[in-house]
Every structure is written in C-alpha cells, then in structure tokens.
C-alpha cells in the first residue's frame, strides 16, 4: 500500500475499522448524492440515507466482517481488495472501486 491521497487514506482507515459500521463510514468525505452499486445483490442506491439503510442494513444482516487485502489509487479512482466473511463463515473476495470527484469526495462506488 503506497503513499495515498487524503481521501484514499480515509477510505483505508474506514476499511480497517469497518466493524464501526456507518458511523465509521460517515467520516469519509462523500458527495451528498453519491451512488453505490452492488450488482450481485441488485442494489443501486443514492445518498447518505439509502446507503445507510440498504447497504449497511444488509451488511449488518449478514454479519459481514471486512478484511482489507490491498488498496490501490490510480488517478481519480481508489480500488480496495477485500475478503468479506459472513456470519456463516463464507468468505467472498470483493473488489470495491471508489470514484473520487474534483473536490476529493467519494462520488460513486461499485462493489464487485
């Protein structure tokens, strides 16, 4: 994990402390109408409230534990490689791509 920009460091800090849920995520700078897509679950949400209710509700329901494997920054994108373990012990390899806007905030996220 090389030297990262402030927004990439904020994302990294959240991923290393993801057990703090939405409270930890809310410390990351985000555009007010940011979007998150999780194609495997058919989730397409927009804004703080929908992300909190849909995404973090789902993560809580499945008992998700996130392990940050690597984080890479390339231009206006930050990519996180994760192992996500659910309450039944199943481990998923997840790639999250964060698009950063020109104000240094998360503008869009894809969880693949």
Indicate where each model-derived feature is located.
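A beta-strand edge to alpha-helix "cap/lid" segment located at domain peripheries
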Residues: 2, 37, 52-112
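Generic, well-ordered alpha-helical segments
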Residues: 43-50, 90
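A short gly/proline-enriched turn/hairpin at secondary-structure junctions
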Residues: 33-45
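Short acidic-aromatic low-complexity motifs
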Residues: 1-33
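Short, flexible segments with low predicted structural confidence
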Residues: 22-27, 43, 70-71, 77
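Residues at secondary-structure transition points
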Residues: 1-4, 42-46
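Residues at or immediately preceding the N-termini of alpha-helices
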Residues: 22-23, 48, 103
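Short histidine/acidic/glycine/proline-rich micro-motifs that form metal-
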Residues: 16, 40-43, 85
